[in-house]
């Protein structure tokens, strides 16, 4: 009886160790997949490929960038991205400094920094921006990761307001 109990204990310990190792392997694989997704996303922006850029978002994603209202849904994001990639001056690079995957394995987030150059539609001057971002990802049924929330904050102060002609 004691021998059977000892065998059961060893088998249980080995099973738990295997499960723990598998969880760690899955977590590491998910982190690498999210990192690879962001690397590909930067390449898609460099190629100015609207379809590939938008494919990184879920259908119900939200994009929040400085100076504009939140953009909700893939169709609205596509419209914004189309305008961006039409700009010959567009150059966007971003790099995650942190990637974290939830223990549940279905959500992840990245935070990092970005640099952006584009043409100001009003002044026609090139704007150089830099700042931080946080992107929340949801794991898809096919195992890929797509952004559900993409939030950008600029480190560049807004232009100084000019006094109005009414003196207010």
Feature roles, as predicted:
Residues 1-9:
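Bacterial N-terminal signal peptides that target proteins for export
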Residues 12-13:
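Repetitive helical segments and hydrophobic/amphipathic motifs
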Residues 21-55, 62-168:
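A beta-strand edge to alpha-helix "cap/lid" segment located at domain peripheries
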């Amino acid at each position: 009886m004691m021998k059977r109990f000892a065998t059961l204990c060893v088998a249980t310990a080995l099973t738990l160790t295997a499960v723990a190792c598998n969880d760690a392997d899955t977590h590491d694989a998910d982190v690498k997949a999210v990192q690879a997704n962001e690397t590909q996303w930067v390449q898609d922006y460099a190629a100015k490929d609207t379809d590939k850029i938008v494919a990184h978002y879920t259908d119900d994603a939200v994009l929040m960038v400085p100076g504009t209202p939140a953009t909700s849904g893939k169709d609205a994001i596509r419209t914004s991205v189309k305008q961006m990639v039409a700009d010959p001056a567009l150059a966007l690079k971003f790099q995650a400094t942190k990637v974290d995957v939830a223990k549940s394995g279905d959500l992840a987030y990245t935070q990092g920094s970005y640099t952006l150059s584009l043409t100001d539609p009003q002044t026609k001057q090139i704007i150089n921006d830099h700042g931080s971002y946080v992107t929340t990802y949801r794991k898809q049924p096919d195992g890929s990761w797509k952004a559900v929330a993409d939030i950008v904050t600029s480190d560049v102060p807004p232009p100084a307001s000019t006094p109005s002609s009414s003196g207010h």
